UniProtKB/Swiss-Prot annotation:
It comes from the Bacteria. GTP 2 binds at residues 209-216, 256-260, 321-324. Residues 377-461 form the KH-like domain. It comes from Salmonella typhimurium (strain LT2 / SGSC1412 / ATCC 700720). Residues 3-166, 203-376 form the EngA-type G domain. GTPase that plays an essential role in the late steps of ribosome biogenesis. This is GTPase Der. Pfam families: KH_dom-like, MMR_HSR1. GTP 1 binds at residues 9-16, 56-60, 118-121. Keywords: GTP-binding, Nucleotide-binding, Repeat, Ribosome biogenesis. Belongs to the TRAFAC class TrmE-Era-EngA-EngB-Septin-like GTPase superfamily. EngA (Der) GTPase family. One of its GO terms (molecular function) is GTP binding. The gene is der. Signal peptide: none annotated.
Amino acid sequence: MVPVVALVGRPNVGKSTLFNRLTRTRDALVADFPGLTRDRKYGRAEVEGREFICIDTGGIDGTEDGVETRMAEQSLLAIEEADVVLFMVDARAGLMPADEAIAKHLRSREKPTFLVANKTDGLDPDQAVVDFYSLGLGEIYPIAASHGRGVLSLLEHVLLPWMDDVAPQEEVDEDAEYWAQFEAEQNGEEAPEDDFDPQSLPIKLAIVGRPNVGKSTLTNRILGEERVVVYDMPGTTRDSIYIPMERDEREYVLIDTAGVRKRGKITDAVEKFSVIKTLQAIEDANVVLLVIDAREGISDQDLSLLGFILNSGRSLVIVVNKWDGLSQEVKEQVKETLDFRLGFIDFARVHFISALHGSGVGNLFESVREAYDSSTRRVSTAMLTRIMTMAVEDHQPPLVRGRRVKLKYAHAGGYNPPIVVIHGNQVKDLPDSYKRYLMNYFRKSLEVMGTPIRIQFKEGENPYANKRNTLTPTQMRKRKRLMKHIKKSK
């Protein structure tokens, strides 16, 4: 499970600065839902291979209304959602009554809490944090969020319990590996395969969307049709529910972010949107069903969720619910709007359904299987290199400083999502337009549907880089003769 880190503290202690520094590693603000999240912002970040979700909360400015009340509005919710809390204080301003009130509340919660003293740049950290030891939260971590000083050390301590989940990276001679695979494939031999068989694993399917778009209705419709649910496996109170099921002799794990409930027990309170549940479900899924309300159309919240799905590299099927009862004219308008606003994700299948009446629900699983198979398909190095060569022949890379960018070979760099690694010279100077061209060319050539393709570029190393030129004895004698000739001519 992806860990969740919440930033809490008074206003202007640097929470947003730290949030921006952390999420900038992925260059994405995941979601900002006014009115739903109480000014909380959610971001996705990565440190040394460990991904986590970061929550930036609004500041708590005083105790006049009671810390409990102010916390309940935004920060308390963030604390409850989080696995770890970073309590930030201002080292320049010193200890404030609001800091003491927040610390008192945090001590009453059974959450790992790290006391972070920000704005220590230009100060003696040891002296600046002395007063904050009275808060009773243990070790203090001095940082300067604006400059990044101390942030990495802090995160190493914060994420330590989850670092065991990160697989160590092995050093691989990719050039040697490529030529070995290429030679084997040219000789008609099968390239060595790893032990991973995607068809032997159940497909993890997450159903996500805004409140009241019909997620629970769709979940109950799917489960009601199949009637093969063995048992529910709830995690903690904030975890999604994982439901094993089977359809057409294929195993699935349905990740329900709202919980499976009887129709009579579904209330507005129970249907409340949980951002964290949704983000974690997306991270844990193989395929995501994004449910959209046909009557309301595409909203900014839908696009925020869509952005997170794409950034996560998950396979995607778009489900337009509540299609029944709409006039033909309205249906055409909805389709035109979808084509306009979702034109940039032409790789995803779009289904128009009625979860309430069941129309179109059965067709979803064909697209789910297609998307999963596309995302886990193994493609040989030789095939990827041939596709790259054809793409270059059809459209040459641009000139960079008078020299044409040279693409050498391509190989698979990962799956779910599919990653194609292209090696070449000056690839860092390729314009984004050509990178998009290559991505679309690979997608069409491989007939990938339902999943994004990622292209990574690696610069070929110059074997003479950082090496001093050494003249041969013949070259040295020639150099001496030339130098004598130059001196005589003077």
